[in-house]
Amino acid sequence: MPAPVSVRDDLCRLVALSPGDGRIAGLVRQVCARALSLPSLPCEVAVNEPESPAEAVVAEFAEQFSVDVSAITGEQRSLLWTHLGEDAFGAVVAMYIADFVPRVRAGLEALGVGKEYLGWVTGPISWDHNTDLSAAVFNGFLPAVARMRALDPVTSELVRLRGAAQHNCRVCKSLREVSALDAGGSETLYGEIERFDTSVLLDVRAKAALRYADALIWTPAHLAVDVAVEVRSRFSDDEAVELTFDIMRNASNKVAVSLGADAPRVQQGTERYRIGLDGQTVFG
């Protein structure tokens, strides 16, 4: 099956984003790559080290964003807003791109699938100085991934909830996707995610997906061969590709978590949502 054009093209657009003078994008791409021990995304402007107090703040924030976003402190947030002002949000979205696109590359290459999504690795890049980063991510790339339909909804939801817990995204942990519930998801099943390796309720396919999610989140540069082999043996090529992109889509919660903007929409219990035909989240 050929790559969904929207996902492939939207991923290439993310790689090509180089707003302003390109220094912040270049800096966070280098910082995140070093933190992950992965190859950096291409940069229009190579920035190996910060050259101003503002860039030093960005570099520290980006490193923590990659290593463990849940550990970002209030002081780090305050410094970011103080030094960047209204540009802070865009800088954090740039961190998300710098942090997770290399993980996707590592995952796809380890699985031996999806090379059609990685043309930007060796191909020419037409740098984009004008497109808004948040629009490209939240209105373009993420809905395109959500429209992929190879993977079953229960596996997608298990992986989403695992990522929510690993990043400690409060709103994500409070949400439940309706199509997954309709397909057999339940609170009993979801309660097994935390101890999935020893669960008797989760099948081998679910466990393979969850191990792979953990690997991309915590050890993307050292993705174990047995983890990749297990995914390849349990999922089709299209499913494995979608699983990889689902993990990146779910990890967009790192933007909200890093900025302390991940409060749940409900005071107690959970809230249901579904993915619309356009790939956007529909609550209620």
Curated annotation (Swiss-Prot):
Domain of life of the native organism: Bacteria
Family per similarity comment: To E.coli YnjA.
Annotated source species: Mycobacterium bovis (strain ATCC BAA-935 / AF2122/97)
The protein's name: Uncharacterized protein Mb2340c
